[in-house]
From Swiss-Prot:
It comes from the Eukaryota. The cysteine framework is V (CC-CC). GO terms for molecular function: toxin activity. Belongs to the conotoxin T superfamily. Transmembrane segments: none annotated. The lineage of its organism: Eukaryota, Metazoa, Spiralia, Lophotrochozoa, Mollusca. Residues 1-19 form the signal peptide. Residues 20-42 form a propeptide. Keywords: Disulfide bond, Neurotoxin, Secreted, Signal, Toxin. This is Conotoxin Ts5.5.
């Protein structure tokens, strides 16, 4: 490949790697939010606020 083709390939690879990193970060953030939400529900329910307790 000529230098321009090499640079384009390199840029595409770099962009793909950055995209993959972003997706991992999004999953991590979603996991943290889910954990915080679960904890908040347990705390809310433990202080006898029945409106926030999960119905079983």
């Amino acid at each position: 490949p000529n230098p321009l083709e090499r640079r384009i390939q390199s840029d595409l690879i770099r962009a793909a790697l950055e995209d993959a990193d972003m997706k991992t970060d999004e999953r991590s953030v979603e996991g943290v939010i889910s954990t915080i939400k679960d904890f908040a529900v347990k705390v809310c329910c433990s202080v006898s606020l029945k409106f926030c307790c999960p119905t079983a």
